[in-house]
Amino acid sequence: MIVDCHTHVGLAGQHVRGAIHEDLMRTWGRPLWHVPLEEHWAAMTAVDRAIVLAFDAPRVGVEVPNEYVAAYVAQHPEKLIGFASVDPHRDGASDLLEHAITRMGLRGLKIAPIYQHFDPWSSEAYALYEAADALGIPIVWHQGTTFVRDAPLIHARPILLDEIARRFPDLKMWVAHLGHPWCDELIVVVRKHPNLYADMSALTPRPLQLYLALASAVQYNVADKIFFGSDYPFTTVEASLAGLRSVNRVVEGTGFPRIPDEVIEGIIHRNTLELLGIAESAPGARPS
């Protein structure tokens, strides 16, 4: 089974606007984050399951609502799994998360301190971690770099999760994009904590960085804690699979060690949903 653990939906001008839309245009020259639902569905042909992320980051202009994601994944429950997103600054944030999980059928929480403008060690953030822990759902983090100008990198370092993982040892969490450019920092934190994982989404366009991160993961014996993801629409499933399988090309003829084929295929075929505890259907949950 192939699981894409990191995909986005959302329409430019409706869900993605303002500052982040301007920065997308500056960086890519086009509204890259514009994903009609039918395009997302077609893009997931190459995988067996896919996680679809809501995104509640109004401070940078992104609001992909929980309701929108829940209604979409409910159309394809055999394949799609929806994750909620809640800005910790919102009044009643923990209640909003509980509603998204217990009433809408969403299965996890997406948070991004640099886009939601919060300190990962703040009391508001800890209240969300406590709610996720009580609900028994995983959290996916964006802890790494960004093209968005109004996204404070002071909150981006993976090392900030060390204390959180220690305080919540039963809370399953993973960090997107291998925490790049701080991949080694993330890997040593993942090594410490049984409940912490990573995904390699959006790194295949940077093959040297991906190779170095995977080599470090092999050396620290945590390659089995890396999930496959694309970060669609920023990359495609097909390009991510091809880039991962060809990662050793970047060091051909150098004498550097190859990433073993079994490591690469292990990432692609990782039992991600089982490791996160979300392989089974959510009992009693329904979109609302």
Annotate each PLM feature.
Residues 2, 50, 80-82, 139, ...:
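Hydrophobic/aromatic residues located in beta-strands of well-ordered beta-sheets
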Residues 49, 59-155:
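Active-site gating/metal-coordination segments in enzymes
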Residues 12-19, 64-65, 96, 151-153, ...:
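Short aromatic-enriched loop/helix-cap "lid" or pocket-rim segments at secondary-structure transitions
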Residues 6, 69, 73, 82, ...:
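Conserved, mostly hydrophobic/aromatic
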Residues 18, 107-108, 121-228:
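Catalytic pocket-lining loop regions of alpha/beta-barrel enzymes
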Residues 10-13, 57-60, 88-92, 145-149, ...:
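Active-site environment of divalent metal-dependent phosphoester hydrolases
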Residues 32-40, 64-70, 93-96, 158-160, ...:
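Alpha-helical scaffolding within the catalytic cores
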